[in-house]
Amino acid sequence: NKGSGFVKLVDKDSGHEKTVSFLPETYELSVEDFNPNGINGKPYAGLYRTGGRALDLKTNWLDGGAMNNSSYEGVAVSTEGEAYESVRLRSVDKPQEILSRSGWIAFVQKYFFAALLGSKDYIYNYYVLPENSGVYRMGYTVESSIDGGMVYGHKHRLFVGPKVRKDLMQRSDNLELAIDM
């Protein structure tokens, strides 16, 4: 199902729906999960990436690619207790978790990043996992006071784009700190 500015994916067997919408703010998406029957468990969102680099990335000194050889690639998290914490992807050697109301978690690079943006309405368990078969993973689960309760839906926000300070300051607390990694 497709509309103006959104795509809806439906699993006819389970009734699960996923609607991906482009928000008015550039570089930001809303991903809404909904199941009319409910699902046992916690809402979650996760991003995956490899350690690979763009095929057109210059790395040869003579071609002007010296800076790209040491370009920072990591994961960053912002929580109510820590405004900004970052670690290089290759330094993540064990699973890491932190609980926080609001905040965000992101894969960061020198000029661009992809961030899952939390809401002040929920408590998140942000996680980062070490590399497994060439893939890095990070994301969150949404915590609930109702243990084992049914979940019918959740809306996630995803930012994928450039690090422009004035733009990032309007999206989420401390998001602009990813610029000064």
Stretches with model-predicted labels:
Residues N1-D180:
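Soluble non-transmembrane domains of integral membrane proteins
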